[in-house]
Amino acid sequence: MQGQAQQQAYDRGITIFSPDGRLYQVEYAREAVKRGTASVGIRTPDGIVLAADKRSRSPLMEPTSVEKIHKTDDHVGIASAGHVADARQLIDFARRQAQVNRLRYGEPVGIETLTKNVTDNIQQYTQVGGARPFGVALLIGGIEDGSPRLYETDPSGTPYEWKAVSIGADRSDLQEHLEENYTEELSLDEGVGLALRTIAISNDDELTAAGVDVATVASDTEEFIELTNDEISAYIADNDLEPAEETDSE
């Protein structure tokens, strides 16, 4: 009973390490990320690709009300997995940081600088009493000094830079697919195709344009662009991800 009581104390105390050096609330926040639908980020020489599974919970839900990818500044976007409300708070914070940088220095914020500002904010919520960690992971992708940069944040407040990465549900399967198929010579179009094929692994239903968000940031224009449903449908068709047509059996 005493051991169980000690376990509960470490569970409830966000700022208390367990005897084996664990912060249980941060670990639980990571579990919340795993319950979210998948998002994928891919870095290519031509730019950044962000894709996110945004399947709605009901056919009555308006698909446009589900947002998984957000424009943060002209040259950077963020995809999320986990608690949507937590993601919204962090994305609003990131947007404010980007605006402050433009007002103060007259130039776009660096992707690495923006990521570290966001992760510093996340990390504070692992040390402050009366709060809880953010139950969300983010992919922050954009162009910095003409070069594509792609970062992941997790609930501990740790930033990681990647060439290709997935967050959310079925991460191990999606990451394995990326490791097997990613090359550093991918074009931006090929990156979109790889991102959609990766998302399809986590999607039990057929992949549709209404069920996925895709955005790119090209190196030459440094412009964040969200793909339209028609453009996504064309990529789905080009990558043989369309639902198979049913044939009548005699």
Curated annotation (Swiss-Prot):
Among the record's GO biological process terms, what is one? Answer: proteasomal protein catabolic process
**Membrane-spanning residues where?**
none
Q: State the family it belongs to.
A: Belongs to the peptidase T1A family.
Which compartments does it reside in?
Cytoplasm
What this chain does, per the entry, is described as: Component of the proteasome core, a large protease complex with broad specificity involved in protein degradation.
Name a single GO cellular component.
Answer: proteasome core complex, alpha-subunit complex
This chain's protein is named Proteasome subunit alpha
- Taxonomically, the superkingdom here is Archaea
